Regions:
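Short acidic (Asp/Glu) and glycine-rich catalytic loops that position anionic groups and cofactors
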Residues: 45-48, 102-111, 180-190
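C-terminal non-catalytic interaction/assembly regions of soluble proteins
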Residues: 141, 146-196
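Alpha/propeptide regions of enzymes that mature by internal proteolysis
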Residues: 1-42, 48, 68, 121-141
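Catalytic cores of large soluble enzymes that bind and process phosphate-bearing ligands
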Residues: 6-13, 56-60, 113-120, 168, ...
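A conserved active-site cap/scaffold subdomain adjacent to cofactor or substrate pockets
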Residues: 57-161
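Flexible loop/turn segments at secondary-structure boundaries
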Residues: 37-39, 85, 118, 184
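Short coil/turn connectors at secondary-structure junctions
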Residues: 2-3, 23-27, 31-36, 60-65, ...
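Short acidic, glycine/proline-enriched helix-loop-strand junctions
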Residues: 45-52, 59
C-alpha cells in the first residue's frame, strides 16, 4: 500500500502568508515550504500594496526578480563561470545579488559592492531559464509567469535592467514534493573545470 510508504508531502505555498505576517508587524517571517519567488513576492506585495491577481506585469516582474535571486550566487556568475571561456572575476569572493525594484515592478539586478562575481545580460539569461521548463508558463503558486518577452539590458558595470515579464493568472494546481520509502539511495556530485 502506497500510504504505508509515504514519509512526507510538502506543498509549495505562495506569498500570501509572508505578506500577512508583514502586515501584522513581523520583523522576521519563518515559513513552511514556499516557492522560491514567494520570498521576494511577499515583501513586494506588502511594501507596494500590490494585489497579486490584478497586476499581471508587476507580478511578472516580481516572479522574475524572485527567480533570479533564488539561487543566490548563480546570477552573479557562480554557475555561469567556465574558466577560459566564460571568465568571472574574483570567483573566490563571489558576491550575492541585489534587486533594486520600484513600485511599477521595474528592476535592476546588481551585487554587493566590492565583491567578486559578475552581473551581466548573460548571467541573467542563464539564471532566468534555470528550472522553468516553459518560458511562457513558469508555474508558481502566486502566478503563472510568462518570461517569453523578457529583455535584459546592461546599464552599468554589474548592473542589468530586466523588463517585460508578465503573468497569466494563478495555476489550477500546486506543486507537491513527496517523499516515500522505496529502498533507493542516490549520490550526486557536480564538478567544475575549465581550460585554466
Amino acid at each position: 500500500k502506497k500510504k504505508d510508504v509515504l514519509i512526507s508531502a510538502n506543498v509549495y505555498m505562495g506569498a500570501e502568508g509572508i505578506t500577512k505576517a508583514l502586515e501584522e508587524g513581523a520583523n522576521l517571517v519563518i515559513t513552511g515550504r514556499v516557492s522560491d519567488p514567494a520570498l521576494t513576492i511577499g515583501p513586494l506585495v506588502y511594501e507596494f500594496g500590490w494585489n497579486i491577481d490584478d497586476n499581471p506585469d508587476q507580478m511578472g516582474q516580481a516572479v522574475l526578480a524572485g527567480h533570479l535571486l533564488e539561487c543566490a550566487g548563480q546570477v552573479t556568475g557562480g554557475y555561469f563561470a567556465d574558466p577560459g571561456y566564460k571568465d568571472v572575476p574574483d570567483l573566490w569572493k563571489l558576491g550575492f545579488p541585489l534587486i533594486e525594484i520600484d513600485e511599477t515592478g521595474a528592476f535592476t539586478v546588481t551585487k554587493v559592492e566590492g565583491s567578486g562575481g559578475l552581473v551581466s545580460v548573460d548571467t541573467c539569461k542563464e539564471q532566468m531559464i534555470y528550472e522553468i521548463h516553459n518560458p511562457k508558463a513558469y508555474l508558481t503558486p502566486d502566478a503563472t509567469a510568462d518570461f517569453s518577452k523578457v529583455t535584459f539590458r546592461q546599464i552599468g558595470e554589474n548592473q542589468v535592467r530586466a523588463e517585460h515579464a508578465t503573468t497569466h493568472g494563478r495555476p489550477e494546481t500546486l506543486k507537491v514534493s513527496v517523499g516515500y520509502k522505496d529502498c533507493f539511495i542516490g549520490e550526486g556530485e557536480i564538478s567544475y573545470g575549465g581550460s585554466n
